[in-house]
């Protein structure tokens, strides 16, 4: 803000400000100076109290720290850091090595919730631990804490009469603030109003929180902060914890389901000389010792099929894939999939397995085959998704012809330039965007997305893809130009992809060569030729079916999340603004470099 003196002169030929504007600015300057002086006075007072607390173990506000809550976060951090430093100087360790917990907060609540109001079990002493979310004083000798952990809350009713000594009672309660992690040794009981509590004999500070914790009443709603500081999100928002519990249940269910079918869980490389197994753009890394580029895996498929060649008939893997593509509501550069390969099976068998797995999973986790989903967020329209088997099945080309109202060329001609031109013209006529290169496979994919996928609310198998879209799938046994492949769509999004595997090494090499031509034409997502895999096929791959499912998208449906970042603990985020980062660093340095008291 310009000072009054600055306002009295012309700058770069600009006219002087009016008298009223000068008065307004002078008044604003005075108000700002008063505010800064008041804040400085408050900081000095708090620093003085912090030093006094460490020396005398007593403060005027019973240790609740109400005035501290009025400070800005940086001031609060500075005061708290110096108070903790003072504890260390006085010989006390605010970060003890160990605190033995007898019973979890959840177990405590389950075991003692039947107590009657006013009960106090003095013959039972237990140890619990958790994070303080609220602190309330009722006079000088009774302080209440809300202790949270494991998604539950337990009240701590600290009374000087029950504490090991009044001096210790004052000392510990002066130290504690919202956000601190504490250990509590005490007796189960209930207040006269019926609030289940632990009545402490001793409280131990286990790890102080140096930052001002947002109040649960207001919560943490800013999505940028929630995703960048997931630890804070988990501290304040229990619904986030519940989402990741559901995610863990999904993975556990899949693993158990496949184990019972006799599948062997395996691990395959995440860095490869050649990226393969899917049509996608890979990440490139560099290996110093080998002096060569390596690719982060986009899919584990080729390794799995080589293991089936080796005689392991049923294999599966749950792990991360990496694709150097866009970030949006349903895509993250690294994501989790489950893939399995089953010898002596075809895509019809996998449709049945998919129905059993998904319907059973939804019923097991939610208690019903039907779920409610909000694709546009909690405030948007709600859809009911029914996972009751069997799922709807449609043939891709036949259904696309119906939706477009046109007769497409015979599928045996889909690899011709004439078909590509027809599809190109249809996309133009229907205003369907397709960035170059406008290959037949890409044009088909855009048309299917625009006209078929949008009809798939309940689980729907889109089957029998053209061969030009499926370089690793086996040709259809009765429909020339098509493959025995399906994709499962739910709420317009693909969650599964599977097919009868191509096991003819000559045909596989030919398709790889066609993919190489597409890559040379500018298609970054086309596949490389993998000679090692082709050689493995020459030893004989039995009739096999392969399947892949995105864990993240399934989790989105079962947790009613419309953004993939909600179901990833640490999603990919754009870097923060450099100026903001520098300012934050400068602030941190200034608060940590201050003198100790």
Swiss-Prot record:
Please list the residues that bind substrate: 277, 301, 339, 341, 497, 501
| Record-listed ATP binding positions | 323-325, 331-332, 494-495, 550-553
Any Gene Ontology CC annotation = aminoacyl-tRNA synthetase multienzyme complex
Q: Which SUPFAM superfamilies match?
A: Class II aaRS and biotin synthetases, Nucleic acid-binding proteins
CDD domains on file: LysRS_core, LysRS_N
Top-level taxon: Eukaryota
**Its Gene Ontology molecular function terms?**
ATP binding; ATP:ADP adenylyltransferase activity; lysine-tRNA ligase activity; tRNA binding
Tell me where in this chain the PTM N-acetylalanine is found. 2
Q: Does the keyword Secreted apply?
A: yes
- Give the sites modified to Phosphothreonine: 591
Which keywords, in A-to-Z order, does the entry hold?
A: Acetylation, Aminoacyl-tRNA synthetase, ATP-binding, Cell membrane, Cytoplasm, Ligase, Membrane, Nucleotide-binding, Nucleus, Phosphoprotein, Protein biosynthesis, Secreted, Transferase
Q: Which residues carry this modification: N6-acetyllysine?
A: 88, 141
In the record, Phosphoserine modifications are located at: 207, 395, 590, 596
| Annotated localization | Cytoplasm, Cytosol; Cytoplasm; Nucleus; Cell membrane
Gene3D superfamilies xref list = Bira Bifunctional Protein, Domain 2, Nucleic acid-binding proteins
Membrane topology annotation: Peripheral membrane protein
One record GO biological process: positive regulation of macrophage activation
Catalytic reactions of this protein? tRNA(Lys) + L-lysine + ATP = L-lysyl-tRNA(Lys) + AMP + diphosphate
Q: What is its main location?
A: cytoplasm
Family designation: Belongs to the class-II aminoacyl-tRNA synthetase family.
Per the record, the domain comment is: The N-terminal domain (1-65) is a functional tRNA-binding domain and is involved in the interaction with DARS, but has a repulsive role in the binding to EEF1A1. A central domain (208-259) is involved in homodimerization. The C-terminal domain (452-597) is not required for interaction with AIMP2.
Physiological role: Catalyzes the specific attachment of an amino acid to its cognate tRNA in a 2 step reaction: the amino acid (AA) is first activated by ATP to form AA-AMP and then transferred to the acceptor end of the tRNA. When secreted, acts as a signaling molecule that induces immune response through the activation of monocyte/macrophages. Catalyzes the synthesis of the signaling molecule diadenosine tetraphosphate (Ap4A), and thereby mediates disruption of the complex between HINT1 and MITF and the concomitant activation of MITF transcriptional activity.
What is the protein name given in its UniProt record?
A: Lysine--tRNA ligase
Q: Which organism is it from?
A: Cricetulus griseus
- The gene behind this protein is KARS1
């Amino acid at each position: 803000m310009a000072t009054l003196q600055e306002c009295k002169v012309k700058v770069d030929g600009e006219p002087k400000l009016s008298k009223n504007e000068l008065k307004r600015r002078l008044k604003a300057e005075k108000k700002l100076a008063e505010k800064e002086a008041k804040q400085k006075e408050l900081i000095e007072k708090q620093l003085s109290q912090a030093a006094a607390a460490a020396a005398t173990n007593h403060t005027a506000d019973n240790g609740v720290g109400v005035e501290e809550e009025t400070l800005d976060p940086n001031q609060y951090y500075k005061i708290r850091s110096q108070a903790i430093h003072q504890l260390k100087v006085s010989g006390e360790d605010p970060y003890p090595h160990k605190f033995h917990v007898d019973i979890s907060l959840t177990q405590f609540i389950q075991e003692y919730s039947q107590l009657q109001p006013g009960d106090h079990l003095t013959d039972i002493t237990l140890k619990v631990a958790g994070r303080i979310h609220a602190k309330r004083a009722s006079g000088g000798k009774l302080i209440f804490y809300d202790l949270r952990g494991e998604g539950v809350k337990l009240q701590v009713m600290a009374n000087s009469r029950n504490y090991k000594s009044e001096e210790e009672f004052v000392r510990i309660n002066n130290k504690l603030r919202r956000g601190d992690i504490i250990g509590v040794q005490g007796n189960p009981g209930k207040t006269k109003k019926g609030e289940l509590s632990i009545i402490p004999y001793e409280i131990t500070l286990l790890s102080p929180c140096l930052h001002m914790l947002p109040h649960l009443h207001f919560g943490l709603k800013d999505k940028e902060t929630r995703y960048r500081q997931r630890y804070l999100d988990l501290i304040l928002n229990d619904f986030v914890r519940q989402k990741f519990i559901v995610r863990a249940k999904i993975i556990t269910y899949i693993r158990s389901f496949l184990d019972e079918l006799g599948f062997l869980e395996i691990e395959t490389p995440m860095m490869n000389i050649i990226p393969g197994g899917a049509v996608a753009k890979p990440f490139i890394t560099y290996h110093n010792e080998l002096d060569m580029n390596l690719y982060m895996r986009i899919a584990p498929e080729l390794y799995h099929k080589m293991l089936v060649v080796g005689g392991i008939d049923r294999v599966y893997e749950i792990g991360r894939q990496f694709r150097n593509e866009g970030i949006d509501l349903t895509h993250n550069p690294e994501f989790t999939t489950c893939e399995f390969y089953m010898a002596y099976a075809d895509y019809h068998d996998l449709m049945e397995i998919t129905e059993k797995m998904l319907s059973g999973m939804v019923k097991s986790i939610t208690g019903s085959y039907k779920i409610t989903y909000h694709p546009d967020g909690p405030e948007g329209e709600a859809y009911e998704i029914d996972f009751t088997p069997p799922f709807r099945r449609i043939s891709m080309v036949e259904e696309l012809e119906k939706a477009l109202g046109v007769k497409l060329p015979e599928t045996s001609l889909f690899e011709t330039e004439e078909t590509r031109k027809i599809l190109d013209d249809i996309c133009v006529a229907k205003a369907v965007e397709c960035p170059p290169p406008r290959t037949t496979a890409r044009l088909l994919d855009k048309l299917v997305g625009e006209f078929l996928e949008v009809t798939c609310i309940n689980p729907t198998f889109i089957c029998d893809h053209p061969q030009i879209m499926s370089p690793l799938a086996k040709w259809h046994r009765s429909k020339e130009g098509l493959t025995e492949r399906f994709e499962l769509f739910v709420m317009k999004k693909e969650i599964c992809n599977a097919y009868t595997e191509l096991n003819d090494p000559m045909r596989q090499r030919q398709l790889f060569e066609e993919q190489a031509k597409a890559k040379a034409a500018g298609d970054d997502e086309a596949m490389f030729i993998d000679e090692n895999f082709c050689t493995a096929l020459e030893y004989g791959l039995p009739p096999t079916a392969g399947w892949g499912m995105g864990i993240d998208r399934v989790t989105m449906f079962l947790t009613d999340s419309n953004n993939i970042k909600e179901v990833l603990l640490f999603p990919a985020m754009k870097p923060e603004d450099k100026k903001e980062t520098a300012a934050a660093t400068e602030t941190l340095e200034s608060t940590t470099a201050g003198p100790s008291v």
